[in-house]
């Protein structure tokens, strides 16, 4: 992927960069693999805001992605690399030999015409999905399952890759992109390779309108609000927040206060991120 930079014809263009989309080979998605979902604008089923700063944006259709990779021992040919407006990674359209079509996350070195397969007997090459027990130590992987058969939930964004560090008994040790070292059951599957669109992290938004197209609304400072909307609100003009430390909109300590809840699976984390 290459980054396209514009001439500074306006303040928004000056710091504006986009993907060249040179790896995209098909402009229209596969109709049978599309699902329409109503934009909820960050609201739950009661209409209350559960995620702030969401709303608007361009209409999109959901591409049904095969995160489970449960079509075992059936070869599939890569027919196209496509853009997906709902994620940062590119997706690949796979034609299986039995006639079925599916979308998968596209690894960086996947090309049209490549043959991929899922299963314990698959070769550990880019795009193939195998149990962690069948993947050589040191291999870069993505789309990692935490519970066997439920589909990959970790390492799915553009340019991401985890590394299989070791295997011991029923567990494999995986280093995640955040630096966290975590044990995962060795019968859980993962896909070999690094996810494509590697330079996505270097893109510059450039202007507020582009974020609105992506469905992101403005973020207002708490000190600019009234006191009934935020702990930092109120006062005359540029007043200090009036407390010893910053607070969230719900009155909890912000910036450095640990909010991660304890989970049963925390015992599988060998080393925290950072």
From Swiss-Prot:
This is Large ribosomal subunit protein uL2. The keyword rRNA-binding applies. Belongs to the universal ribosomal protein uL2 family. The keyword RNA-binding applies. One of its GO terms (biological process) is cytoplasmic translation. The lineage of its organism: Bacteria, Bacillati, Chloroflexota, Dehalococcoidia, Dehalococcoidales. Residues 1-23, 222-242 are annotated as: Disordered. The gene is rplB. GO terms for cellular component: large ribosomal subunit. It comes from the Bacteria. Keywords: Ribonucleoprotein, Ribosomal protein, RNA-binding, rRNA-binding.
